[in-house]
A protein has these predicted regions:
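Gly/Ser-rich catalytic/binding loops embedded in alpha/beta enzyme cores
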Residues: 1-124
């Protein structure tokens, strides 16, 4: 996927197909980099964390629920470091672009997720 707004965590590639027959089948979603995705490290907005911990053994409840519903996970998104911010600015990964107002920050610790949806990178 081409990330035109800097919403996805750099250097990551995450794709997990959802259940084929769920009510969300055909929809895509991204997960904030605070949610565990089985087989992938959870960085929490800090580039050093993934190298110092094992990949997640299972999906976070929210991620698994969306997958069980049929949605397909297509990436992990930037967050303020350890989700401690209100602007969506990450000194390590950069600030995602606010498609609706490029001269303004996307805002909130879920800025990467919001930027991804606004830019059409995913549905949810």
């Amino acid at each position: 996927m081409k990330d035109t707004v800097g919403a996805l965590v750099p250097g990551t590639s995450v794709h997990v197909d959802g259940a084929a027959d769920g009510p969300l089948s055909g929809l895509t979603f991204v997960a904030k980099d605070l949610f565990d995705v089985a087989g992938h490290p959870t960085g929490g907005g800090n580039p050093d964390w993934p190298g110092n911990q094992a990949p997640a053994k299972e999906n976070a409840w929210a991620v698994q629920t969306l997958l069980d519903g049929g949605a397909t996970l297509v990436g992990k998104t930037i967050t303020d470091e350890v989700s401690l911010g209100i602007l969506g600015e990450n000194v390590f990964h950069g600030t995602p672009v606010n498609s609706a107002a490029p001269d303004r920050v996307p805002g909130g610790s879920s800025a990467g997720s919001a930027a991804a949806v606004a830019a059409g990178l995913c549905d949810i």
